[in-house]
Design a protein with these regions (language model features):
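Canonical alpha-helical transmembrane segments
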Residues: 59-70
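Cys/His-rich metal-chelating microdomains
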Residues: 52
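Secretory/periplasmic and organellar redox-cofactor proteins
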Residues: 2-45, 56-57, 72-236
Length: 236
């Protein structure tokens, strides 16, 4: 580590991984909230809501890929593309309701803003954050291979979080694919869908705990099958 570098190589990778873990957790929280809103409160998503949820899933794929296979610029680029699609969808929904005088908006409001407004804010922050991380070259230059490459001290925790996150993304994709069939059929989805089944919070919490338990088991066996090669990074 040179005198001008504040962080060592391992510290740099640790900070980069923690940033991606935090981003993945935040996006999973948003997606979990959307599932709870759909099944717990019976609020079926509108067509633009489905676009935003799908884009949020794509946005979360970037951090997951960084954690699994190492820090790569193309992973951030994938998240930026997903955020641009989601931002366009949420901006379109905002303008639709703003253009109609007296329109109360679609769905519940949180802290004075509807969910599509919060989605737009999330996508804007994601684009700005990915742009800043793209300008941070050191994690790209260190040859990081991710949790599926070489061993590091927090690999087990990172592997568990990533697998748990990917399972959540898979569940959300399945929910989108299955729910649009009875809701939309083979045509366009209704702009203002009727209320759906209200299953309560118990089902949502059971799903979260079940996914966490399965992810922990998978992460344990993956960890056992991985080699014992210690992590090495390129010298600065």
């Amino acid at each position: 580590m040179s005198d001008t570098q504040l962080l060592s190589d391992k510290q740099t990778l640790t900070v980069a991984r923690l940033i991606n873990i935090a981003a993945l957790f935040a996006l999973l929280g948003v997606l979990a909230g959307s599932l709870n809103l759909q099944f717990g409160a019976g609020e079926l998503p509108c067509p633009l809501c489905l676009v935003q949820r799908s884009a949020m899933i794509g946005l979360a794929v970037g951090p997951a890929m960084n954690l699994l296979w190492g820090m790569k610029a193309r992973h951030y680029a994938l998240s930026i593309l997903a955020a641009l699609v989601g931002g366009a969808g949420s901006a379109r929904q905002i303008l639709l309701h703003v253009a109609t005088p007296g329109d109360p908006g679609f769905g519940p409001a949180i802290l004075g803003f509807h969910l599509y407004t919060w989605a737009f804010i999330t996508f804007v922050i994601a684009v700005a954050g990915c742009a800043v991380l793209l300008m941070w070259n050191r994690p790209f230059d260190l040859g990081d291979t991710g949790v599926l490459g070489k061993r590091h001290w927090h690999r087990s925790l990172t592997l568990f979080i990533t697998i748990w996150g990917l399972m959540w993304l898979l569940v959300d994709l399945l929910v989108i694919g299955i729910s649009v069939i009875p809701q939309c059929g083979l045509g366009l989805c209704p702009d203002d869908p009727p209320p759906g089944a209200d299953l309560g919070d118990v089902v949502g919490w059971a799903l979260v705990l079940g996914l966490g338990a399965v992810a922990a088991v998978i992460a344990y066996f993956v960890e056992r099958r991985m080699g014992d090669t210690p992590e090495r990074v390129n010298a600065s």
